[in-house]
Amino acid sequence: MFGQRLDTLGAMSSSVSSPSPETGKKILLAAPRGYCAGVDRAVETVERALEEYGAPIYVRKEIVHNRYVVDTLAEKGVIFVEEASEAPEGAHMVFSAHGVSPAVKEEAAAKNLQAIDAACPLVTKVHNEVKRFDKQGFHILFIGHEGHEEVEGTMGHSLDRTHLVDGIESIPGLPAFLADEPNLIWLSQTTLSVDETMEIVRELKKVYPQLQDPPSDDICYATQNRQVAVKAIAERCDLMIVVGSTNSSNSVRLVEVALQAGAKNAYLVDYAHQIDEAWLDGVQTIGISSGASVPEILVTGVLERLAGYGFDDVEEVTTAAEKIVFALPRVLRPAR
């Protein structure tokens, strides 16, 4: 297993390195970064399914939001489809780490698909909260990004009582009756910016003073701790490079967090070759992080490319240690 839990350390630690005396150029490497426990579980689920059942294995949507991971699995015999109905009758299908709605599971059952759910357990936790609060008669204000697979899957568990809040600007468009609704609670997508989410909550409470907080935070440990790690180095950086795909919510948020925390510039790249040499003009210190669905090999590629431009002194700045591991879906666990 590869995923690990993040427990904030009492003091930030770093590997000590001095800028090159010749160039003064330096890289600050944020830690933790990259794969989280939920992504580890999802990718290993697909790999184990290939070993157990052979190709092809069908996956609804992208198993995780990373181009390299998807392309690598496709080369091994994974077929990615938009909907369960696109898979042939009786095929093996894996649901992505982002979770699915009951309607998707019903669609898979109608085609007798051998479904394996690779949803991150932290996403499943939010699904269970939605179902519980729906059953208790609450209306739910769900903070998230419209069209994101996690949002669609989560809201599918309470179609009539869950209302999407996609940014502060969407608040005026919420149903008018919610102003008089006594049982009102907010929940959120797991991969949002912590600061942005709480800003939205503050605005919601101005409109809905009765709005209740959830019993626990929905933004996942990996998302939060990667943001903390970026904040720890951003102010020292002339440039921040985040490795991740444009459809990865948590990766995009890291770019935003870096800029808000003081980085002079920040870019998102899938691969090292996407780094534009012009970005490096006048730059002495570069910060590097990666989203929760990014394998470390892609970060290594970025470090190697930057070394070619004289950025060969690397200081890893660690703000937390990761120890969490999620078990595979039961059907793929080794027999005891």
From Swiss-Prot:
The record, for Gene3D superfamilies, names: 3.40.50.11270, 4-hydroxy-3-methylbut-2-enyl diphosphate reductase, catalytic domain (3.40.1010.20)
Q: Which InterPro entries match?
A: LytB/IspH (IPR003451)
The organism's superkingdom is given as Bacteria
User: For dimethylallyl diphosphate, which residues are the binding ones?
Assistant: 65, 98, 148, 248-250, 293
Which residues are isopentenyl diphosphate-binding? 65, 98, 148, 248-250, 293
Which residues does [4Fe-4S] cluster bind?
36, 120, 220
Under Gene Ontology molecular function, one entry of this record is: 4-hydroxy-3-methylbut-2-enyl diphosphate reductase activity
Enzyme Commission number(s):
1.17.7.4
Q: How is the cofactor bound?
A: Binds 1 [4Fe-4S] cluster per subunit.
Q: Residue ranges of region Disordered?
A: 1-23
Q: In which pathway does it act?
A: Isoprenoid biosynthesis; dimethylallyl diphosphate biosynthesis; dimethylallyl diphosphate from (2E)-4-hydroxy-3-methylbutenyl diphosphate: step 1/1; Isoprenoid biosynthesis; isopentenyl diphosphate biosynthesis via DXP pathway; isopentenyl diphosphate from 1-deoxy-D-xylulose 5-phosphate: step 6/6
Q: Which reaction does it catalyse?
A: isopentenyl diphosphate + 2 oxidized [2Fe-2S]-[ferredoxin] + H2O = (2E)-4-hydroxy-3-methylbut-2-enyl diphosphate + 2 reduced [2Fe-2S]-[ferredoxin] + 2 H(+); dimethylallyl diphosphate + 2 oxidized [2Fe-2S]-[ferredoxin] + H2O = (2E)-4-hydroxy-3-methylbut-2-enyl diphosphate + 2 reduced [2Fe-2S]-[ferredoxin] + 2 H(+)
Active site residues of this protein:
150 (proton donor)
Give the main EC class.
Answer: oxidoreductase
Q: Does the keyword Magnesium apply?
A: no
Please name one Pfam family that this protein belongs to: LYTB
Q: Which UniProt keywords apply?
A: 4Fe-4S, Iron, Iron-sulfur, Isoprene biosynthesis, Metal-binding, Oxidoreductase
Swiss-Prot/TrEMBL cofactor(s) = [4Fe-4S] cluster
A GO BP entry: isopentenyl diphosphate biosynthetic process, methylerythritol 4-phosphate pathway
Q: Which residues bind (2E)-4-hydroxy-3-methylbut-2-enyl diphosphate?
A: 65, 98, 148, 190, 248-250, 293
* Residues forming coiled coils: none
Q: What does this protein do?
A: Catalyzes the conversion of 1-hydroxy-2-methyl-2-(E)-butenyl 4-diphosphate (HMBPP) into a mixture of isopentenyl diphosphate (IPP) and dimethylallyl diphosphate (DMAPP). Acts in the terminal step of the DOXP/MEP pathway for isoprenoid precursor biosynthesis.
Hey, which family's this protein in?
Answer: Belongs to the IspH family.
Q: What is this protein called?
A: 4-hydroxy-3-methylbut-2-enyl diphosphate reductase
Q: Which organism is it from?
A: Corynebacterium efficiens (strain DSM 44549 / YS-314 / AJ 12310 / JCM 11189 / NBRC 100395)
